[in-house]
């Protein structure tokens, strides 16, 4: 039902234009102090959206999130203490 989504961090010159970013995806978070917005869009359209957003005059730079490409399943680095003292 839902496609894969990916986030991009859009750095802005001014937050006055942050509402315009709604056209390009779902706004997840806006930082007033650091002047950036986290915008989610479909993975298939991420390159196209980044190209369109770079053309806007109020955008400083855009960074793509690499979370979909990272391994998020971790192994336990320390052994379980309860299993260490199993005497049976």
Swiss-Prot record:
Compartments (UniProt record): Cytoplasm
Main localization, broad class: cytoplasm
Stored InterPro entries: DUF2129
Keyword Kinase: no
Keyword terms: Cytoplasm
Cellular component GO terms, alphabetical: cytoplasm
Keyword Transport included in the entry's annotation: no
Family assignment from sequence similarity: Belongs to the UPF0298 family.
Name assigned to this protein: UPF0298 protein BC_3932
């Amino acid at each position: 039902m839902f496609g894969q989504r990916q986030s991009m961090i859009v750095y802005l010159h001014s937050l006055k234009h942050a509402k315009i970013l709604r056209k390009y995806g779902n706004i997840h978070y806006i930082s007033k102090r650091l002047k950036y917005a986290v915008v989610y869009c479909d993975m298939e359209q991420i390159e196209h959206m980044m190209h369109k957003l770079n053309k806007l005059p109020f955008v400083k730079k855009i960074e793509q999130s690499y979370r979909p490409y990272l391994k998020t399943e971790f192994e336990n680095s320390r052994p379980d203490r309860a299993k260490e003292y199993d005497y049976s």
